[in-house]
């Protein structure tokens, strides 16, 4: 009886090990099924824009219709479509003719290589400008100091000009001071004339005295 018991124990453990070995295989198969078999969003967008014959470009609404007709779920992947459009415009594969951001009309860039070359040419040209801008800034500070030195003689000239203005004003004051003297002389002359007119009045009483003396002789 003791020999049959240990033989049954290994028989039970063996199927458990086999089941554990089969589980990772199923998981591997599930991961393979999650990978998208169809083309990416950017590829679908480029195909739809290339198929359109509109001169002004394909609008966002027309692009969604074209993607929906191809079996793509537009409602669930709306954000992906917008991100795909922005990335394609940034790369230079698409050109935005109207609107801003993901909204508007889009066309295929016929010369994508030229846009990339222009972008690469502009970047190195911007780097040497930074050290060149610093040098004139230091040189510009020196002429400011020289300008401050030049301003000091201007201040010295201002008091000289003020002195000339005061000297010019002083004869006017002297002329004004001379005018009241003439006015003061004129009333003095008028006073001298008045006593002359009073003399004939004093002569009248003398004539009256002469008349009174005449009857005494009779």
UniProtKB/Swiss-Prot annotation:
What is the name attached to this protein's record? Histone H1
Q: Which residues carry this modification: N-acetylserine?
A: 2
- Taking the first listed entry, what is the main subcellular location of this protein, grouped into a coarse class? nucleus
Q: Which GO terms describe its molecular function?
A: DNA binding; structural constituent of chromatin
Show the segment(s) annotated as Disordered: 1-41, 89-218
What this chain does, per the record?
Answer: Histones H1 are necessary for the condensation of nucleosome chains into higher-order structures.
Q: The H15 domain covers which part of the protein? A: 37-110
Compartment(s): Nucleus; Chromosome
**InterPro entries tied to this protein:** H1/H5 (IPR005819), Histone_H1/H5_H15 (IPR005818), WH-like_DNA-bd_sf (IPR036388), WH_DNA-bd_sf (IPR036390)
For whether the record's keyword set contains DNA-binding, the answer is yes
């Amino acid at each position: 009886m003791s020999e049959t018991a240990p033989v049954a124990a290994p028989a039970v453990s063996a199927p458990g090990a086999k089941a554990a070995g089969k589980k990772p295989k199923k998981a591997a198969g599930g991961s393979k099924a999650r990978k998208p078999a169809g083309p990416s969003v950017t590829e679908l967008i480029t195909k739809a824009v290339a198929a359109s014959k509109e001169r002004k470009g394909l609008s966002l609404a027309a692009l969604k219709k074209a993607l929906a007709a191809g079996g793509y779920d537009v409602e669930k992947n709306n954000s992906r479509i917008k991100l795909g459009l922005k990335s394609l415009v940034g790369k230079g594969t698409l050109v935005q003719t109207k609107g801003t951001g993901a909204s508007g009309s889009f066309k295929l860039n016929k010369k994508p290589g030229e846009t990339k070359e222009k972008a690469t040419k502009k970047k190195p040209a911007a780097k040497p400008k930074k050290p060149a801008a610093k040098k004139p800034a230091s040189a510009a500070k020196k002429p400011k100091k020289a300008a401050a030195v030049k301003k000091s003689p201007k201040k010295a000239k201002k008091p000289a000009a003020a002195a000339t203005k005061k000297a010019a004003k002083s004869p006017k004051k002297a002329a004004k001071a001379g005018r009241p003297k003439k006015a003061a002389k004129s009333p003095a002359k008028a006073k001298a004339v008045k006593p002359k007119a009073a003399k004939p009045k004093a002569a009248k009483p003398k004539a009256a005295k002469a008349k009174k003396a005449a009857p005494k002789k009779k």
